Amino acid sequence: MHRIKLSDLRGIDKQIDRVEQNTKQFIDGKPANNVLLTGARGTGKSSIVKGLLNKYARQGLRLIEVEKNDLVDLPMIVDQVAGRPERFLLFCDDLTFHGAEEGYIALKVALDGSISTTSENLLIYATSNRRHLMPEYMAENLETRYVGDEIHPGETVEEKISLSERFGLWVSFYPFDQDEYLDIVAQWLKHFGAAASDASREEALQWSLQRGSRSGRVAYQFARDWAGKHAKKK
């Protein structure tokens, strides 16, 4: 069981609410969407999914983590879970494709609702640092056509967008500012039994500069380090 609690996550309340509401609908047997969570690294995308499992496991929620290369086995996975009473989230973490890979094609087919790759008790939740799951290149902009005042993306861009558009719910995440970062640090320090102080805040900012990021993950790692160094000996 994942130990992450939704209540531990800071600065992403709106994102939590959207994903949790969709998940509750799914657990209750109501219509719900496949979900794509995109944005900056370390901002809580995968933590939300794991926190949902922690919160709703007793209500029948289950998580199946799948690497992108294993997405070709989707029909077999669906066959294994179809008819079971639990509600399954097929979870693809940090998903990025670099072309028409087998996993890309399999996922596209599943999101299209192919009978062999869908079940009423299974949804696909994916996280990615790329909004459209694939790298974007400057040269692709040269394919753009202009018809009057309208802009028409080229075929390459259209193909890349086509996969992400198949997810019914998009949830975006953004980098934290300094105050949000320090709030997350304070939350994790409390979690580890330490109190925030002027010294810890100063060290936390130095830590983030060294890491080149003020993400939730960096805040968590700092809090573990600080709490460990300043914990009273037992």
What positions do the PLM features span?
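AAA+/P-loop NTPase substrate/partner-engagement loops
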Residues: L6-L9, K55-F88, L95-A100
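Conserved catalytic/switch belt of AAA+ P-loop NTPases
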Residues: G83, G99-D149
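Pre-Walker A adenine-sensing motif
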Residues: D13-D28
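Dynamic helix-loop-helix/coil hinge segments at AAA+ ATPase domain boundaries and subdomain interfaces
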Residues: M1-D17
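Conserved AAA+ ATPase "SRH/arginine-finger" region at the nucleotide-binding site
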Residues: I64, S128, Y137-M138, R145-I161, ...
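C-terminal alpha-helical "lid" subdomain
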Residues: Y174-K234
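Walker A/P-loop nucleotide-binding motif
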Residues: G29-G51
